[in-house]
Amino acid sequence: MAKNVVITGATSGIGEAIARAYLEKGENIVLTGRRTERLEALKTEFAEIFLNQKVWTFPLDVTDMSMVKTVCSDILKTVGQIDILVNNAGLALGLAPYQDYEELDMLTMLDTNVKGLMAVTRCLLPSMVTANQGHIINMGSTAGIYAYAGAAVYSATKAAVKTFSDGLRIDTIATDIKVTTIQPGIVETDFSKVRFHGDEARAATVYQGLEALQAQDIADTVVYVTSQPRRVQITDMTIMANQQATGFMIHRD
């Protein structure tokens, strides 16, 4: 029987790749994200390719707590049991010493990467507890392990994701719910373009001189982690580019 997979931040990059990977595996997917037009475009595209899977779309801004509650309730009413939740929505904004950081950028990262992730989990977790099964994937980052210059807030948010996942695993120990933190290194997506507020030239320098990870690499990892036997729980998975040793210790050609 096909599983029902909810993916936040599914309109591009890693989230979109995860959606495609689960559809290729034969699962049903729930796409959520802020860009309604992109959600509908993906739904149309997927419907033409994956004829036997169900695709639902729900516009969602994870920083809007009221919206999170409403949308999660609608998802449960429409889809039924959720087997896998992929908390992928997240972002970095800016790169500067903490004392010079833009307050709005800081708050947006905290609201999205931490509060939003926790809010979605809080709304969908009770149904998993009732069903005594489920798998929660929380998207962390190597930045949560290795802080680097100019990214104190982003690193802190991703460290929080890791710690939250560990606590959640403890709280659900008496159930068959699994919790995994995925911690990617440098992945070539629109991540840096978003971080630098649309500055494509600056974003491109992040990936120069190295073969960065691709969104598909992370998607394949997520599917692998959630495809293990019931007895196996992979708690953490760290994936870095071959030219990346730690955080921003990178060898560039």
Residue ranges and their predicted role:
Residues 121, 157:
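Active-site helix of classical SDR
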Residues 11-13:
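Conserved glycine-rich cofactor-binding loop
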